[in-house]
């Protein structure tokens, strides 16, 4: 079995390197069809065919246990990526979760999806050589996962107001930090996300992950001013989320890539939908992987009986994941639970999250038999001492049998 996996990985690497031509090695662009992206590299904005993508995805085997870092688009598109690759080379990390469309609505790379081109999502791309960078990850044994933010997309909301949450007094509704949201009742919002995800898989990402698969979590008085134009009579927020995560799964399933969802950590504890449309049983019935965000700093005072949940990384994560496991078992769900763990300090909230607090969360998960996880730091800054060193093959005999 190990030999088969080694051969499959070698085939994936060979195919990726053989077919990689870079994003902009396809033809000559006429004058005036480029603009300066954020990194000051001239990037094509005209409608284009994704000729650097494959007609069919080339999928390799996923690691038996995924130990991943969240990598934001800026980090992926800059020299910081090489620092993170080196960190993975030297530690237990074997996967990166990369922002392909983040909560600004901007794309990681130029997209051929018509809606992305129409709304200007290609005007703020983060890298000009995504395919070459993906090839590098594959060469280093790093499993690439594409992350897509769905409902919090101010760029889409501004350019497609008919797809957006409206204010009862007119214009776009905005959250407490002034961000416009798209209407999670609207089918087109989710179809757009599915189109982008299919494109990413054909580019070389091995798995897709959807975040903000929900309605806004805002104070009641602000939500009372929100109007959702696409809501059907009698349709609840839960109905909309459940139908649309199924749509995402069905649109991606033919490509063979795992379909995964990030959800609130409290979803496994709640009896309702938290006012955002997320119910644990709905996700485990649809997803290949569910990723509850069990950050101790995000739990309310008194959660699980702790006055300061942020100061209890081991016990909060253990309680949260035990509830998730307990709710999944009666359903016989095959969905994997792969938690997001806190690798950041929230403001001035103490304690500061050092390698000790991070390892305590990992220990809590692993003691429950959950051996896959993702570390979240919004700046993609990680502490080496929070990670175990990479296990190396002990000798030629182990190498010849395929290694790990």
What residue spans do the PLM features occupy?
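Active-site-proximal loop/short-helix segments
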Residues: 154-162, 203-235
């Amino acid at each position: 079995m190990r030999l088969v996996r080694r051969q499959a990985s070698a085939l994936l690497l060979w195919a990726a390197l053989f077919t990689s031509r870079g994003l902009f090695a396809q033809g000559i662009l006429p004058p005036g069809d480029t603009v300066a992206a954020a990194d000051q590299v001239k990037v094509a904005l005209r409608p284009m065919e994704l000729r650097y993508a494959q007609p069919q995805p080339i999928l390799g085997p996923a690691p038996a246990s995924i130990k991943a870092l969240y990598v934001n688009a800026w980090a992926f598109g800059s020299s910081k990526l090489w620092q993170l690759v080196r960190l993975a080379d030297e530690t237990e990390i074997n996967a990166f979760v990369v922002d392909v469309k983040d909560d600004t609505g901007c794309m990681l790379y130029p997209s051929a999806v018509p809606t992305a081109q129409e709304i200007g999502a290609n005007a703020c791309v983060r890298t000009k050589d995504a395919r070459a960078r993906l090839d590098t990850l594959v060469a280093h044994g790093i499993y690439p996962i594409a992350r897509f933010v769905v409902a919090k997309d101010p760029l889409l909301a501004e350019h497609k107001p008919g797809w957006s949450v409206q204010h009862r007094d007119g214009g776009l509704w905005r959250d407490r930090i002034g961000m416009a949201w798209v209407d999670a009742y609207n089918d087109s919002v989710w179809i757009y996300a599915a189109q982008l995800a299919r494109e990413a898989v054909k580019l070389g990402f091995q798995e897709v992950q959807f975040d903000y698969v929900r309605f806004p979590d805002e104070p009641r008085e602000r939500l009372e001013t929100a109007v959702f134009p696409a809501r059907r009579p009698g349709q609840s927020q839960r109905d909309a989320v459940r139908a649309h995560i199924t749509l995402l799964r069905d649109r991606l399933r033919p490509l063979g890539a795992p379909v995964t969802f990030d959800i609130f950590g409290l979803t496994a504890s709640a009896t309702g939908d938290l006012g955002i449309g997320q119910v644990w049983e709905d996700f485990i019935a649809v997803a290949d992987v569910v990723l509850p965000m069990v950050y101790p700093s995000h739990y309310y005072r008194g959660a699980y009986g702790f006055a300061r949940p942020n100061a209890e990384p081991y016990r909060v994560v253990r309680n949260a994941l035990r509830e998730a496991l307990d709710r999944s078992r009666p359903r016989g769900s095959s969905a994997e639970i792969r938690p997001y763990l806190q690798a950041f300090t929230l403001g001035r909230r103490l304690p500061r999250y050092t390698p000790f607090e991070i390892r305590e969360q990992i220990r809590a998960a692993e003691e429950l038999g959950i051996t896959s996880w993702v570390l979240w730091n919004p700046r993609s800054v990680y502490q080496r001492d929070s990670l175990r060193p990479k296990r190396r093959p002990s000798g030629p005999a182990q190498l010849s049998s395929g290694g790990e």
